Amino acid sequence: MSAPQWFVPVKAGDAKVPAYYPTDDMIQEQKKKLRTRKGAKITALDKPAWNLEKLRKSIVPGAILIIVAGKYAGKKVVFLKQCIKSGALIVTGPFKINGVPLMRINQRYVIATSQKVDVSKVDTTGVDVKFFKKIAIKKAAFGKTVEEDFAKKQYEAKKALIVEKQKQVDESIVAEIKKVPYLKEYMASYFTLKNGDHPHLLKF
């Protein structure tokens, strides 16, 4: 049996042992194994959260939801997909019909209806946590700085990206909404309750 490459012979009676052994051959073997890995690189945003909230059975892509709390309470939105990092629902009015933009909302603040819209052709690529992250512009104490100018450019670029994505999503969804009679008027109307109405007994 031949000795390994890193083996260093020691004379009889010599108790001195080298402190380090050459490991170049081992490192090369490890690098070869790393190169053989296949598949696309998975980033942190592509991995779903370990505690991702499960959606109700009635909340499926394309379902029309009624917002019951917040700034847009009473308005209807179309559910696009679930954010894999926060578990929030990504919805849109669409903005062209009722003024509700692309936004995130928790499922506890919506009521799902039986009406659905085909959203298979809607491109939601890039609409994730990073898409909704706000860019804060902090003014320096002594006038403008390079960092402030750079932040403003980032803010304008982000704003243009959001507007362009909103137009793209609205174009696809509005086309599907127009296929269903009176659905456009339904999406534009507010949801209200009258005296004697019980939400838990209503069928949406």
UniProtKB/Swiss-Prot annotation:
The record's section on InterPro entries has:
60S_ribosomal_eL6, Rib_uL2_dom2, Ribosomal_eL6_KOW, Translation_prot_SH3-like_sf
Record field: transmembrane:
none
GO molecular function (one): RNA binding
Which Gene3D superfamilies is this protein grouped with?
A: 2.30.30.30
Q: Name one GO cellular component term.
A: cytosolic large ribosomal subunit
> Which SUPFAM superfamilies does this UniProt record tie to the protein?
Translation proteins SH3-like domain (SSF50104)
> Which keywords annotate this record?
Cytoplasm, Endoplasmic reticulum, Ribonucleoprotein, Ribosomal protein
GO process annotations (BP): cytoplasmic translation
For the keyword Ribosomal protein, the answer is: yes
The keyword Iron-sulfur appears for this protein: no
Question: The organism sits in which domain of life?
Answer: Eukaryota
Q: Where in the cell is it found?
A: Cytoplasm, Cytosol; Cytoplasm; Endoplasmic reticulum
Q: Which Pfam families match?
A: Ribosomal_L6e
Q: Which family does it belong to?
A: Belongs to the eukaryotic ribosomal protein eL6 family.
Q: What does this protein do?
A: Component of the large ribosomal subunit. The ribosome is a large ribonucleoprotein complex responsible for the synthesis of proteins in the cell.
- Quaternary structure note: Component of the large ribosomal subunit.
Protein name according to UniProt? Large ribosomal subunit protein eL6
